[in-house]
Design a protein with these regions (language model features):
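Extracellular glycan-modifying ectodomains
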Residues: 21, 32-37, 110, 117, ...
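A structural signal for well-ordered alpha-helical scaffolds and beta->alpha junctions
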Residues: 12, 147-151, 238
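PAPS-dependent sulfotransferases, especially Golgi type II membrane carbohydrate sulfotransferases
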Residues: 158-246
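Selective for proline/serine-rich intrinsically disordered segments
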Residues: 29, 52, 98, 232-233
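PAPS-dependent sulfotransferase catalytic domain
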Residues: 46-193
């Protein structure tokens, strides 16, 4: 039996729709995409697979002779994207400076709140725990944007027959409806690249995007947050991020 699982934010509903609408074995109509909403309105038939979500014991399923497929990411970029989409789609907003519930802890400063979120992000994307890397067939969600052929190949691995023209169209719609999230991570990655190269230019970042940049820098330089100078205000230039490294 084929079992399917996914990390929150990893386009699980989208991938189930892909299986059921872009293969010869599937018989569902092509789904309608809603901008920035993924396909949470899509109700899978679960005939071609058994869904295990939010928990899936991959090793136990494999011990029973089942094959386990998942939507996830093996790249740091993809994992930042998954976390961003998971937060945005489940709570309707992403953590902000002085959030009264999540990140405002006993009156901590902007920089201290930023570090809490940054370290949390770094620890999460750096660990392989909960990303289902031990699954038999892993779909990397970044391929929806960059490599539809890999999406078709993944369907083929499942023992299904992909309809390539439909897969390509599906990937265009899936990526377009989530482009805002992809662009946010790409913007942060570009800024971090420029900080590393010491290129000076203005930046406009949300609190969460600033935390992403901060955690990317921690990851790149393999340092702890205590090794960086505390930010006292939102950075408006790459120079402000360059300065905290010195």
């Amino acid at each position: 039996m084929l079992v399917f699982c996914y990390h929150n934010g990893a386009m699980g509903h989208t991938t189930m729709a892909l299986i059921e609408t872009c293969t010869k074995e599937g018989n569902k109509e092509f789904p309608s995409f809603i901008n920035q909403q993924n396909l949470h309105h899509y109700i899978p038939q679960c005939v071609l697979f058994r869904l295990q979500h939010p928990k899936c014991n991959v090793l136990a399923e494999q011990a029973l002779g089942n094959k386990v497929a998942c939507s996830t990411s093996t790249t740091f970029f993809g994992r930042y994207l998954i976390l961003l989409m998971g937060l945005k789609k489940w709570i309707g907003d992403i953590p902000n400076h002085n959030d009264p519930v999540v990140y405002k802890q006993h009156g901590q400063t902007y920089g201290e709140q930023l570090e809490i979120l940054s370290v949390t992000l770094k620890d999460k994307i750096s660990s392989d725990s909960d990303w289902y890397i031990d699954c038999d067939y892993k779909l990397d969600i970044v391929d929806y944007w960059n490599n539809p052929a890999h999406i078709s190949a993944w369907l083929d691995q499942l023992g299904l027959t992909p309809v390539h023209s439909q897969v390509e169209e599906f990937c265009k719609l899936a990526s377009a409806s989530n482009q805002t999230y992809y662009d946010s991570v790409a913007k942060c990655q570009k800024i971090v690249d420029n900080v590393i190269l010491k290129k000076i230019h203005e930046i406009d970042l949300s609190f969460y995007e600033t935390a992403m940049c901060h955690s990317m820098l921690l990851k790149h330089y393999n340092v702890s947050h205590i090794d960086l100078t505390l930010l006292h205000a939102p950075p408006t230039s790459t120079s402000h991020l360059i300065e905290i490294l010195s």
